[in-house]
């Protein structure tokens, strides 16, 4: 490979996956076990308080992404920086609860007016330690897809690390297919 000859080796591989058509429609269905409740961020703030919810959100995020170069190790400043965009909508952050314990979250992103053909994105979805291994990942992904489709999305995409086998399997099970493959090279 010419990159190896030039002294570069792949250091990160990122896949773009997408879902549309009948697969997208099918992916809007979800169900959580009894006692597990999905709340959008404003509703969670009303119920538990914004400071508490933000702290629990950060804990779940950092548990889910302890290994991730961009998404892990967040603090409140980093979360606020991420929310300080023109596309951020608090009601596009879905939080998953069992009593007052935050199990996970799904933050969706709109790339413009969904009803005018803009794409929706699975921006960040993660389960904290208390939510893992319980079969909640698929329904949590689908809950976000449901939100985007209800608002008019006809295509939803996401980025995923190529070596994140559990996430890849989960997204493929939902109906996502790989549409792009990005490779970051570093000089060796």
Language model feature labels by segment:
Residues 128, 161:
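Residue-level recognition of the GNAT/N-acetyltransferase active site
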Residues 4-5, 124-127, 133-150, 155, ...:
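Conserved acetyl-CoA-binding loop-helix of GNAT-fold acetyltransferases
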Residues 1-13, 134, 138, 162-181, ...:
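Conserved active-site alpha-helix within GNAT-family acetyltransferase domains
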Residues 1-45, 185-187:
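Acyl-donor-binding surface of acyltransferase catalytic domains
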Residues 40, 55, 105-106, 167:
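Ligand-binding pocket scaffold of soluble enzyme catalytic domains
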Residues 30-73:
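Short amphipathic alpha-helix that is part of the acyltransferase structural core
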